Swiss-Prot record:
Pfam families: PapZ_C, RapZ-like_N. Keywords: ATP-binding, GTP-binding, Nucleotide-binding. This is Nucleotide-binding protein GbCGDNIH1_0395. Residues 299-311 have a biased composition (Basic and acidic residues). ATP binds at residues 14-21.
Amino acid sequence: MSTDQYRRVVVITGLSGAGKSTILRALEDAGYETVDNPPLPLVHDLVARGEGPLAFAVDARSRGFTADGLALAMERMRQLPGVRADLVFVRADTAALLSRYTETRHRHPLASGVGVRDGIRAEEILTASLVDVADLVVDTTDLPVTRLRAMIAERYGPEETGQGMVVSLISFAYPKGLPREADLVLDARFLRNPHYDPTLKPRTGQDRDVAAYIEADPDYATFHDRIDALLRLLLPRFVQEGKKYATIAIGCTGGRHRSVHLVEKLGEELRAQGWSVLRTHRELGISDDAPQAGAARVSTDDRNGRPEEHGSAQAPDELSRTTS
């Protein structure tokens, strides 16, 4: 259905500090009229009387907020003629939320008279039932702002400028944890490691000499070819299932050499096949600002992390001091 046949309405809810304001700003940049924290009883009327795409952030701050009340409001909005309403639930783990509140010294809306941790727990309980009814659940624990904004723009931006499904490629270090948003995780730790070559150790997988060293592994070509075959099978099927975003994470020990090279290599090849690609090197603190589009794809049948030593990725958090 084209954008002139329905009105987009996006309601953002979830945990305070998880990134609702970042998503709201991304939607505003995509042409939505946005309202932050309206009283829940007024949301239906605002949609019924409004024109054009609308986005709301509704959470524990909103007067009259309950999980059941928001679920009922979503049902009523979806019954309005010509309206397509989505519920987006944003969350992050407790450690990430505590870190963001400590950094900004903002007050948690449910922490009156108790600690921030207790406020976070109370909000998790208050909103838990909404996770199951949300159209999109986003965990921003390790998600950089650039990737969060690109994800939202690709899913909810104007269809005439959309690029179809975005393939997100992430390199990471296993000791620092798996990317939570990954649909598929690949392990490159068996490949020869440039870390043990004194001339290559300080470089990264973006370096030609490092790439040549890795590709000289006797099993590299087989590994690469099987990944390519797997993605040629999976990605078109993801599109058939209606996915707008597919995240593939490739890990190694340090997240600097082998995984970085494979993300760079696969990114180039996927763009050549016509996919829209977003690359993130979590441990290097590097991320594309927007998906890099490839050439028109030949149709198939049916058609954040937190780096420690190399710069920091901005937290996708309405509490962040900087703007994205």
